């Protein structure tokens, strides 16, 4: 049984590489749309499941991991900004405020008929940002492929006042919860590998 990460995210790859488990990466191909009335928790769990299922259908003997992360402020989902103006607006909205980062994770092994879906929530409080802080951060080009227009593992850490919860969840893969689920449902220990 192999592990496959159904993600093109370099951050998720790096987090999983810090364990002793061997894995392959296969990029998933799904449309990340929000369904009408869908809550952020349901959205990330559904998208994580769709990502893992899109790969598991052709790799049914493997454990396929899917993940999806969103930033939530005032019950509004902040996805990846489409352009610099959108990123600027997101950072202004986040300035001085606390928001949630929610990551859905899905583990599927079709051969054993196992499907596990979960989510993790972390809270992040931003410093009060000046216009110059926002412009300086935008110049780093970190905003454009990240939910909420920032990456805490890079220069985005300079925007953050406080976090509560799993740091790796904020980066995009809650490795502690993932390790618990792999051990409980698939007898895979991230300390030792498969």
UniProtKB/Swiss-Prot annotation:
Cofactor(s) demanded: a divalent metal cation
Site residues, Important for substrate specificity: 11, 69, 153
Source organism superkingdom: Bacteria
Catalytic activity of the protein: dTTP + H2O = dTMP + diphosphate + H(+); UTP + H2O = UMP + diphosphate + H(+)
Coiled coil: none
Keywords: Cytoplasm, Hydrolase, Nucleotide metabolism
EC number: 3.6.1.9
Signal sequence extent: none
Identification of the protein by name: dTTP/UTP pyrophosphatase
Organism of derivation: Clostridioides difficile (strain 630)
């Amino acid at each position: 049984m192999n592990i496959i990460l159904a993600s093109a995210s370099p951050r998720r790859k790096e987090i999983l590489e810090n364990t002793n488990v061997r894995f392959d990466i296969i990029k998933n191909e799904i449309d990340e749309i929000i369904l009408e009335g869908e809550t952020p928790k349901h959205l990330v769990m559904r998208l994580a499941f769709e990502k893992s299922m899109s790969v598991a259908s052709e790799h049914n003997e493997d454990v396929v991991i899917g993940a999806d992360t969103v930033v939530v402020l005032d019950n509004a989902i902040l996805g990846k900004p489409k352009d610099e103006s959108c990123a600027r607006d997101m950072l202004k909205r986040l300035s001085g405020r606390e928001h949630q980062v929610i990551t859905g994770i899905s583990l599927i092994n079709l051969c054993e008929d196992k499907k596990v879906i979960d989510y993790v929530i972390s809270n992040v409080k931003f410093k009060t940002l000046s216009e110059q802080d926002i412009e300086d951060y935008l110049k780093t080009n970190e905003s454009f492929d990240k939910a909420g227009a920032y990456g805490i593992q890079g220069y985005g850490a300079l925007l953050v006042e406080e976090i509560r919860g799993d740091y790796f969840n904020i980066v995009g893969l809650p490795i502690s919860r993932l390790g618990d689920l792999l051990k409980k449902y698939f007898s895979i220990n991230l300390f030792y590998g498969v």
